[in-house]
């Protein structure tokens, strides 16, 4: 600690550290010229206190390598003297730095809609009613028309067409429009009904709508539009995928849980939890 001096007073135990060039003691009480001969380091730290004691009651104690300095008292005194401009001294010599934490990957759930938690399992009649929208979606869909060329080519599974709802007996075309309007207004937006039932009702209508969107967009591809080998296998894959999705949704409805399908689950949650469009009551 080169260039520092520990200063003490006779009236109180006030000890502080200050540079030699900027000592808090007035210069008229301290002899500014102090010469150190070419001796060892311990002799360089000794000061002649006799010359200073005649003029000033304060003494400058020598600061050696083995000397013990009360840093707590020095910090207290420095806070009292330099409270206006300088920050307080640390009680210890070593600063405790906060360890640098490694970077972690945080899961981003900003665009995810959280579904309400089902505390108790719904009653059996609610679970049965939740399966009806999926059966209606299978009945009014064109799945039987999609898989019919593939089943007719293979005689072993040709009779399977009779077990697919909607393949033989088709409902009128206006039924889908009436069903979607009444189901959306009376069931999905009805807050008095359980959210579990409203969610599965909306999920069934969204799956049927998605199948119609796929049918309209697929007609732009020539190899799929015409009844060829590639088109037969393509529509067979679309039809059986739709049937598997409906069976999975029916399983979730009977189990009393929400069906987890990418994009469809969030869309059904938005329709059941929020009011999109229409006339709403103004906020007060």
Curated annotation (Swiss-Prot):
Organism this protein belongs to: Arabidopsis thaliana
Main location: plastid
Subcellular compartments: Plastid, Chloroplast inner membrane
GO cellular component, one term: chloroplast inner membrane
Listed transmembrane segments: 131-151, 160-180, 204-224, 230-250
Similarity-based family: Belongs to the Tic20 family.
Phenotypic consequence of gene deletion: No visible phenotype. Tic20-I and tic20-IV double mutant is embryo lethal.
Name of encoding gene: TIC20-IV
Transit peptide: 1-48
Quaternary context: Part of the Tic complex.
One BP term from GO: protein import into chloroplast stroma
Membrane topology term: Multi-pass membrane protein
Top-level taxon of origin: Eukaryota
Entry protein name: Protein TIC 20-IV, chloroplastic
Tissue expr: Expressed in roots,seeds and non-photosynthetic tissues. Low levels in leaves.
Annotated keywords: Chloroplast, Membrane, Plastid, Plastid inner membrane, Protein transport, Transit peptide, Transmembrane, Transmembrane helix, Transport
Function as written in the Swiss-Prot or TrEMBL entry: Involved in protein precursor import into chloroplasts. Partially redundant with TIC20-I, but not with TIC20-II or TIC20-V.
């Amino acid at each position: 600690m080169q260039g520092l001096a520990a200063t003490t007073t006779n009236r109180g135990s006030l000890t502080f550290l200050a540079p030699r060039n900027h000592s808090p003691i007035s210069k008229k009480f301290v002899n500014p010229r102090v010469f150190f001969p070419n001796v060892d380091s311990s002799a360089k730290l000794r000061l002649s206190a006799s010359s200073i004691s005649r003029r000033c009651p304060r003494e400058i104690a020598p600061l050696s390598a083995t000397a013990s300095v009360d840093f707590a008292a020095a910090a207290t005194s420095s806070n009292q003297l330099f409270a206006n401009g300088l920050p307080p001294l640390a009680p210890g010599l070593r600063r405790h730095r906060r360890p640098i934490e490694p970077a972690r990957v945080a899961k981003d759930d900003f665009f995810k809609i959280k579904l309400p938690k089902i505390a108790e399992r719904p009653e059996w009649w609610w679970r049965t009613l939740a399966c009806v929208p999926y059966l209606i979606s299978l009945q009014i869909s064109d799945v039987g028309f999609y898989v019919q060329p593939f089943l007719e080519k293979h005689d072993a599974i040709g009779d399977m067409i009779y077990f697919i709802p909607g393949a033989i007996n088709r409902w009128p075309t206006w039924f889908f429009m009436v069903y979607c309007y009444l189901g959306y207004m009376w069931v999905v937006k009805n807050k008095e009904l359980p959210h579990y039932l409203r969610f599965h009702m909306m999920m069934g209508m969204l799956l049927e709508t998605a199948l119609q969107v796929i049918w309209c967009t697929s007609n732009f591809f020539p190899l799929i539009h015409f009844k060829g080998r590639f088109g037969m296998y393509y529509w067979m894959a679309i039809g059986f995928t739709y049937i598997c999705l409906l069976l999975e949704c029916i399983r979730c409805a009977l189990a009393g849980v929400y069906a987890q399908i990418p994009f469809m689950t969030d869309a059904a949650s938005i329709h059941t939890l929020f009011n999109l469009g229409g006339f709403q009551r103004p906020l007060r």
